[in-house]
Amino acid sequence: MSHRADEIRKRLEKRRKQLSGSKRFSTQTVSEKQKPPSWVMVTDQEKHGTLPVYEDNMPTFNGKHPLVKTDSIILKCLLSACLVLVSAIAYKTNIGPVSQIKPAVAKTFETEFQFASASHWFETKFGNPLAFLAPEHKNKEQQIEVGKDLIAPASGKVQQDFQDNGEGIKVETSSDKIDSVKEGYVVEVSKDSQTGLTVKVQHADNTYSIYGELKDVDVALYDFVDKGKKLGSIKLDDHNKGVYYFAMKDGDKFIDPIQVISFE
């Protein structure tokens, strides 16, 4: 009987040792799993179970964006408003010094911006113009044509000379298509009391070509047109003959088109 009791006691002791070893291994495994890798930098605060405190070193701008100078923008807006106000007063009054500003303001607003010259300068200095200035179909061969001999809007016979009015000529032609004599920008499409439906093109050398007595136009304001580009058409009679008006300006001065273009 005592022998059997000793055997049971030994089995219980052996079982207790096995359970004790299993718990020790389990605790060690969990501890190793919780331990961070050796390459992770652990601060003293994290070792003691507290979260690290980070200081915000970003500079403050008191609610103002560092790249936007509000004061400067407001000042420019005020100056612009004052300029517009002075211009309006100059047109509405005839008092002393203020009225003297009127001619200068009028000349400024009447002077057309040199789109063609600006584009040509930009192209010379920096290469091809910006996308919204350059025509999609323009290539290097067409760029070289700037400054070459002018072409006639439409070949024909001159009916009215430059000396008749000191501004332009009238040409009789059998072609209903009117082309641009040189590349440039359309700066005016209007209906004139003397020349009817008229297109005005500005060129890079500060010259202008004017095409009148058109039946319809194929271009719009500020369009770029190449040399030889169709601007519009004229009406032909029963004998397939039509007349168009043409003039050229160098700055503010009219020049005789016959001196620079052959129409026959």
Curated annotation (Swiss-Prot):
Organism listed in the record: Bacillus subtilis (strain 168)
Main location: membrane
TM annotation in the entry: 73-90
Lineage: Bacteria, Bacillati, Bacillota, Bacilli, Bacillales
Bias type Polar residues, positions: 19-31
GO CC, alphabetical: membrane
Compartments, record wording: Forespore outer membrane
Compositional bias ranges of the Basic and acidic residues kind: 1-10
UniProt-listed CDD domains: M23_peptidase
Post-translational modification comment from the UniProt entry: May be degraded by FtsH. It is stabilized by an ftsH disruption mutant, and in a probably independent fashion, by overexpression of BofA.
Assembly: Forms a complex with BofA and SpoIVFB localized in the mother-cell membrane surrounding the forespore.
Alphabetical UniProt keywords: Membrane, Sporulation, Transmembrane, Transmembrane helix
Mother cell cytoplasmic topological segments: 1-72
Protein name as annotated: Stage IV sporulation protein FA
Matching Pfam families: Peptidase_M23
GO terms, molecular function: metalloendopeptidase activity
Residue ranges annotated as Forespore intermembrane space topological domain: 91-264
Database matches in InterPro entries: Dup_hybrid_motif (IPR011055), Peptidase_M23 (IPR016047)
Residue ranges, annotated region (Disordered): 1-37
Keyword Transmembrane: yes
Function of the protein: Implicated in the coupling of mother cell to forespore gene expression. Required for spore formation at 37 degrees Celsius, but not at 30 degrees Celsius. SpoIVFA plays a central role in both maintaining the SpoIVFA/BofA/SpoIVFB complex and anchoring it to the outer forespore membrane. SpoIVFA brings BofA into close proximity to SpoIVFB, allowing BofA to inhibit SpoIVFB. Increased accumulation of SpoIVFA seems to inhibit the activity of SpoIVFB and thus regulates the activation of sigma-K.
BP-aspect Gene Ontology terms: sporulation resulting in formation of a cellular spore
